[in-house]
Amino acid sequence: MITGKNFIGNVLSSIGDVTFKTFNPLANIENEIVYSEASEIEIQQAVELAANAFSVFKTVSGAKKSEFLNEIANEIEGLGDELIKVYCSETGLPEGRARGERGRTVFQLRSFANLVKEGSWVEATIDTADLDRKPIPKVDIRKMLVPIGPVVVFGASNFPLAYSTAGGDTAAAFAAGCPVIIKSHPMHAGTGELVASAIIKAALTTGMPNGVFSNLNSSGIEVGVSLVKHSQVKAVGFTGSIRGGRALYNLAAQRPEPIPVFAEMGSVNPVVILPSAIKNNENNWAKTYAGSITLGAGQFCTNPGLILGIKGGDLTNFIQILSDEIIKIEPTCMLHPAIIGAYENNKTKMQEQDGLKTTASLNKDVADNYGKQTITTVEGTTFLNNTALHQEVFGPFSMVVQCENMQQLSAIISKLEGQLTGTILADNNELENYPSLVSALQNRVGRIIFNGVPTGVEVCPAMVHGGPYPASTDSRFTAVGINSIKRWVRPFSFQSWPNDLLPNELKSENPLKISRLIDGKQTINKI
């Protein structure tokens, strides 16, 4: 049952005066439940509990953390149809999307459970002593990754499960040994509370310390600002807009003790069409990209918002077919009024730019909060000279840039900001002819795709979901996959430390039987 209260550790709390409701964009009405925004007192309590819990949780074994993560997954599944119903009522998204996202969420949790149970992720490294070394004896030094401390995670509006309360940021932080405080997204507070209750149940069942998790409601920016500025918070995870992510990044940098903010933000995900791709296949690629642009009402951070090709008859045909196909697709509901408002505003600003031509725009009346898909096109020279055209329009929108030649196309890629993805459509032989183009695109993105679409982010160890700024605040890390755990850890060394007092991961006898780097060689052997 949803209470509308905050979880301050294991305890429900609602002592603040500010309240709010979520919104059903499909019905265009407020939902009934009233939520209590976290007060400063509750924020302080949650952070202090997290700091106290960290002293215990950081020592919890990988096997026990695995049990905790698996139990969270079990409890989320145990929420059954209630979770699906609330999710849909707060997002306007269809039931199939809700069930798919729930599956992704529990898969992420179980992936991290397997990772920490096996244990080698800590990158244990041992350089043994050589007391006979001349002229200076060599001391014994042993290193491993350790948790960074309490983490604040901001729920994402476009993924109420997979990037929110028990999403990838939270799962990775728990796996690392970090307590988590969620700043719940106001548009899906009910979904967040249900998932929070599942986490609390799992924590109680598996004996995790009180404060390992808290869930704070908020309808504005104040709660998030207070959390990021709190001295006992040691890292932040965020998925959302460039404006929001950069504001948090700046706040964290201004603290007396700056902390990392791992923000996944804006991206137009450029798609490069080489001539061979559409010479005889423009129909198929146009249909494919019409579907990708409108998938989920265009509300994916990997939405293909920019398409680059060489001016000519084949590209003209592609633009025409893409425009025709996208208009055939039924529009869908966007997540909440603020998103549809921002989409319409940013789309209008883009369409007002000199030289931009709209080739497809849905003219028929649609229900409230439905996004009308739009295709635009512009000359390469105009695009190069106007950086306003480089900005993201979050929603079912894409721009096709008609470049004069490959040199101009490469110049455009070099001028782009950092992106999550870049895609090249071509045949193998043609791709080999443009190594500098491929290299330029690699410099701008975190993931490069050949003959596919960027929408869809597989949860797997090889995935990189990140990229140069402003796609993310730190291109060295991924927000998806087991390697995302590295955002919430730091390397730590023990020098000449008694073996019996070392963590099990670093003991000479290797009781956990994990893979370790010992004197430069990877092995599971004891010393």
Language model features with spans:
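Structural signal for hydrophobic packing residues in well-ordered secondary-structure cores
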Residues: 51-54, 58, 73-80, 84-87, ...
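Rossmann-like NAD(P) dinucleotide-binding subdomain of oxidoreductase/dehydrogenase enzymes
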Residues: 120-290, 311-316, 525
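Short loop-to-beta-strand entry elements in the cores of soluble alpha/beta enzymes
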Residues: 68, 176-191, 212, 257-274, ...
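N-terminal Rossmann-like NAD(P)+-binding subdomain of aldehyde/semialdehyde dehydrogenases
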Residues: 1-139, 526
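C-terminal core of ALDH-fold dehydrogenases
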Residues: 366-369, 406, 411-502, 524
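Short acidic active-site motifs
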Residues: 42, 222-223, 408
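NAD(P)-dependent aldehyde/semialdehyde dehydrogenase
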Residues: 3, 15, 287, 309-420
